[in-house]
């Protein structure tokens, strides 16, 4: 078979299906995933931390700001009360996403540049960041409900694996282009200027993302509840035990994952001496390990979404212990080793994780269920970030000694994070059968 015929008959081309509206919807979703990942790579993570540091934000400030997005996401509880009043939501959702992008990428950037007083800047930054994320939380579940029509259950494993390839490629592209530049200018008088300019580049990609998301067909939104009430966000999910158990797992994992996130990145950049590019080796290794995605899909079919997730988490969790021993003199080899293990396990972990919000979600009234998912999962992230920030405040400048090695705050957090991941793994293994969706 010729290469052209293989491409024409491939799963990827079949998934995009140029003859159907659903195929167009998936194409737009994948392109949006590519664009939004570039935006996220610049406006969050290591480049975001470097941007804050270049404008004299401390590790305590960074930890505090890391709490705000997950706190704001908890307010998506108001989303269905607002969105369920509209059967056509395309332009409403686009307006909300545009406002969120402008606040995050334009207003925050200008404030950091022009406001020099540290206290005023932190207060203003917090207010704009909170508003931006509040707007996003109000509209994000609307996109999820709309786009879920394009990925029926039989296509999800394939769709999410290709989405993972695309988003990882976007992360790799953006972080290598912008990460190398940030590392080259680190410590120079141009560092803050270039990191600021990157956020305006991200704004351009964000505007294109808003346009792309307006293109798919919008289907009617099925619902069983005639009245639109806030209490339905709690009342409806309480009827579905499997859904609740799934959301509890998501919340627990988000708590664990958020515990050390911002502090660890700050520690790598400023205490270990790793550059932005080095801190994102995960993306390099992931793009290599993505060739194993078909095998992870087969494992999901053979075992289950949840058991695959648990086995991958068993590989991921011990890397926290490896990372805790990273030092300026050994990070060149130890950090890549831990990151490679994370990338290998991360393919299966992220593939199974992507379906978690949907696997046990009822087909009707999905705005309520997905809003409940966002609230509880965001609450887990918020509590994890808050616990991490409190840990930094309490143990800042303190050390413990293990096996003759002195650990300061950030490595100490990784020991705690390892324990939190173990709790999640045990939860899945004990409840695997009860978590399985009905056929």
Describe the function of each predicted region.
Residues 1-28, 116, 121-126, 130, ...:
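Intracellular loop-helix junctions on the cytosolic face of multi-pass helical membrane proteins
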Residues 3-76, 80-83, 90-93, 105-108, ...:
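Helix-loop boundary and gating motifs at the non-cytosolic
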Residues 34, 103, 119-139, 332-349:
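Hydrophobic core of transmembrane alpha-helices in multi-pass small-molecule transporters
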Residues 49-54, 81, 85, 108-116, ...:
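Transmembrane alpha-helix termini and helix-breaking/packing motifs in multi-pass membrane transporters
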Residues 59, 153-163, 275-276, 361-375:
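Loop-to-transmembrane helix entry/capping segments in MFS-fold secondary transporters
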Residues 75-91, 182, 292-305, 392:
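Helix-to-loop junctions at the C-terminal end of transmembrane segments
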Residues 85-101, 190, 301-314:
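Cytoplasmic membrane-interface "Motif A"-like loop-to-helix N-cap segments
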Residues 97-119, 314-330:
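C-terminal ends and interior cores of transmembrane alpha-helices
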């Amino acid at each position: 078979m010729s290469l052209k015929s293989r491409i024409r008959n491939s799963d990827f081309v079949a998934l995009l299906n140029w003859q159907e509206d659903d195929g167009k919807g998936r194409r737009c979703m994948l392109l949006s995933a590519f664009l939004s990942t570039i935006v996220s790579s610049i406006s969050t993570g290591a480049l975001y931390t470097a941007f804050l540091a270049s404008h004299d934000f401390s590790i305590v400030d960074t930890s505090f700001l890391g709490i705000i997005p997950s706190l704001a996401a908890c307010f998506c509880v108001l989303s269905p009360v607002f969105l369920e009043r509209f059967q056509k939501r395309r332009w409403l959702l686009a307006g909300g996403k545009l406002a969120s992008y402008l606040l995050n990428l334009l207003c925050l950037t200008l404030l950091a540049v022009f406001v020099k007083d540290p206290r005023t800047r932190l207060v203003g930054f917090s207010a704009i960041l909170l508003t931006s994320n509040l707007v996003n939380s109000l509209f994000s579940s609307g996109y999820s409900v709309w786009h879920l029509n394009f990925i029926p259950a039989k296509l999800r494993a394939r769709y999410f694996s290709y989405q993972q390839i695309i988003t990882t490629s976007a992360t790799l592209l953006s972080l290598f282009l912008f990460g190398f530049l940030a590392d080259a200018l680190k410590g120079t008088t141009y560092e803050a200027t270039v990191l600021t300019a990157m956020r305006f580049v991200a704004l351009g990609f964000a505007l294109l993302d808003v346009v792309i998301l307006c293109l798919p067909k919008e289907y009617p939104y099925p619902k069983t509840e005639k009245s639109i009430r806030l209490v339905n966000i709690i009342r409806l999910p309480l009827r579905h035990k499997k859904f609740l158990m799934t959301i509890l797992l998501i919340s627990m994992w988000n708590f664990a994952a958020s515990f050390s996130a911002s502090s660890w990145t700050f520690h790598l950049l400023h205490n270990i001496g790793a550059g932005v590019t080095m801190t994102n080796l995960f993306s390099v290794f992931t793009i290599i390990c993505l060739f194993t995605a078909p095998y992870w899909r087969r494992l999901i079919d053979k075992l289950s979404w949840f058991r695959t997730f648990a086995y991958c988490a068993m590989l991921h969790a011990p890397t926290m212990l490896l990372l805790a021993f990273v030092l300026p003199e050994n990070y060149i080899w130890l950090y890549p080793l831990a990151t490679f293990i994370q990338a290998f396990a991360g393919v299966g972990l992220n593939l199974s994780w992507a379906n978690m919000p949907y696997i046990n979600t009822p087909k009707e009234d999905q705005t309520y269920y997905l809003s409940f998912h966002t609230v509880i999962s965001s609450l887990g992230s918020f509590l994890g970030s808050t616990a991490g920030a409190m840990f930094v405040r309490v143990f800042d400048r303190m050390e413990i000694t293990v096996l003759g090695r002195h650990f300061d705050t950030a490595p100490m957090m990784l020991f705690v994070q390892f324990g939190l991941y173990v709790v999640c793994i045990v939860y899945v293994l004990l409840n695997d059968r009860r978590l399985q969706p009905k056929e």
